[in-house]
Curated annotation (Swiss-Prot):
Domain of life assignment: Bacteria
Segments crossing the lipid bilayer: 9-29
Family indicated by similarity: Belongs to the NqrF family.
Domain 2Fe-2S ferredoxin-type: 39-133
Organism lineage: Bacteria, Pseudomonadati, Chlamydiota, Chlamydiia, Chlamydiales
Name assigned to this protein: Na(+)-translocating NADH-quinone reductase subunit F
Coiled-coil ranges from the UniProt annotation: none
Gene designation per UniProt: nqrF
Membrane topology reported for the UniProt record: Single-pass membrane protein
Subcellular location as annotated: Cell inner membrane
Organism: Chlamydia pneumoniae (Chlamydophila pneumoniae)
Amino acid sequence: MTWLSGLYFICIASLIFCAIGVILAGVILLSRKLFIKVHPCKLKINDNEELTKTVESGQTLLVSLLSSGIPIPSPCGGKATCKQCKVRVVKNADEPLETDRSTFSKRQLEEGWRLSCQCKVQHDMSLEIEERYLNASSWEGTVISNDNVATFIKELVVAVDPNKPIPFKPGGYLQITVPSYKTNSSDWKQTMAPEYYSDWEHFHLFDQVIDNSQLPADSANKAYSLASYPAELPTIKFNIRIATPPFINGKPNSEIPWGVCSSYVFSLKPGDKITVSGPYGESFMKDDDRPLIFLIGGAGSSFGRSHILDLLLNKHSKREIDLWYGARSLKENIYQEEYENLERQFPNFHYHLVLSEPLPEDIAAGWDKDDPTKTNFLFRAFNLGQLSRLDNPEDYLYYVCGPPLHNSSILKLLGDYGVERSSIILDDFGS
């Protein structure tokens, strides 16, 4: 009886605890409705009455502008890490937040510069926004395919209206607008080859419900570099990595949500409609005679492919081009066959593949695990295989894109060799 009594007590206590949680949540929601009054606010833009937008208070400036048809670029998805959603609040600027203070100079803060993803709309405001953002457009596209090209990376291929081409440049990016949705990660197997199942099963990533059905309209968007180049229109491509929660004891932490936009992308199937906006970007090609070195890792493959295919197939560039691409194993390598074909076709293009964790089957197939220019972290392989052998590393132009640790390692390495920061084009979404 003692054991049953204890179990009964635990069950009752658990029910009471859950009930208290539900009541508190209800009180918070009711309080917000009663005490936080939503009211209309006017956003006057560039001192032009015709551009004035009326929005509801309480949202961030980024979301308010997006819902009004002005998609301010926010590659990091509103996390205040990319620092690109800058606007100037000319009138009625609130006190800057710490994220603003770490982004802008004292003079810029006094002039009203703020990160729109952090700035709340509570009253009428006058804004100054760059014309290029006001001229950004949106397009509806149809998903052609959405297959995995690596364990955690999809190649999203979308067809847009050929009569309304997207005027993007290689190295540019578009923002994907995320509607409300609910998905189960097991359904993503429909667009995933079975060879990738084992890792997903090992990390318990299947049968995970991602519920963003209450997502406010037009409240979420994230930027992704284009993997395609302009000559491939009306088809556009992206390489997009799933943002999983951090792992605890080999399983995803249920307390941390999955990436809102990447989960939406992974749920897409051929025939689905999506909306993109832009184009944006700063990491374009510098058209001079300097030889080019691309240092790319993971889903940075988008950025590298767009530039390299445009240089070779569209511009017929004679510049020396080296691509160093880093992946864990051959299963994770992206566009290998395409780059090998380009290398055979163009004598000025050189493709270097580096694996950090080659699989036994890679080694059995002939991969040299003992060559430090092939089996290594990319920055070390690049240093051994090319950088240390250059007479004047500062005379090259470097294009860098990959995970944060990849980017920081490359920047430090190039800095150690005296390469000026102006000679490094970094595509960094603050992930």
